[in-house]
Amino acid sequence: NSANWNRTDGNIYFQVTDEDCERIYRYIVKTASYERLPLEEDVVKNFSLAADAPQVAAYVGGGNYSSGVAYMYDNKKSQSTLFANPMADVYKAIELGEMSEWNFTAADGTLIKGMICLPPSFDSSRKYPLIVYYYGGTTPTTRGITSPYCAQLFASRDYVVYVIQPSGAIGFGQEFSARHVNAWGDWTADEIIEGTMKFCAAHPFVDAKRIGCIGASYGGFMTQYLQTKTDIFAAAVSHAGISNVTSYWGEGYWGYSYNAIAAAGSYPWNNPDLFVKHGSLFNADKI
């Protein structure tokens, strides 16, 4: 359960997607306000209040350089105490790439956030191929090292990695996430293309002739759709991608349930352009 009522202080504790992090917030009932807990990890996947002493909690989290780190949390002192870090020795033996935020302002004035991950033993005098990675369905690409698509894994193969969080992702505010509705690639494609070009211009160690892009599910759709919009990508990987929005809408519970929000009020018979013009199948001649 992502929400916990603390019977000691009367407040409610819950997990929040906060940009590319997973945080724990509490709702303070008396003041009707929200407060973020000052925890030690960027991505907290487990948080539990002690049943008999709710002023004490335990949580497990990680980030770009760690995973599965367990802490005890003192709610009164707002302090964390390390309980266990079973992967510490493993990560000490692995050379990880340096990661940092890289943001840009899109043509329409929107701040688009992202991160760069450099290869281990990075040499700024070299030219590196680039992998551009974006969200699927439309959850932000969270910080972390355990995903099969994590930036560190790509970087370990001697790639520079650009993780972009384009319009439509949750965790960046209601207006930003609502851009996903009845868009199917609008905004998102333009921002990925613009961001990739600006990223290359800002990083001379990137070989602009060797750029690849990758995404899964809706990100897989974006991979395919991008190939109909630009030729800047030398390689493209679409995992579980959608080529035909119409068949996706009508096949399986995932199609109609997802599109109930992603294409709210739109159907093939009342908004055919959304279902035809935004898929790679009906734009294959542009690839």
Q: Can you annotate each of these PLM segments?
A:
Residues 5-7, 49:
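Residue-level recognition of a conserved intra-blade site in WD40 beta-propeller repeats
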Residues 163-287:
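Active-site-proximal cap/loop segments of hydrolase catalytic domains
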Residues 130, 155-165:
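A fold-wide structural signal in alpha/beta-hydrolase
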Residues 118, 125-137:
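Short beta-strand element of the alpha/beta-hydrolase
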Residues 61, 133-137, 217:
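Glycine-rich His-Gly loop
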Residues 138-140, 161:
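Serine-hydrolase catalytic-loop signature spanning alpha/beta hydrolases and amidase-signature enzymes
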Residues 8-10, 54:
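Short coil/turn segments that connect the beta-strands within blades of beta-propeller domains
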Residues 22, 35-123, 149-152, 156-157, ...:
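Non-catalytic accessory segments flanking enzyme active sites
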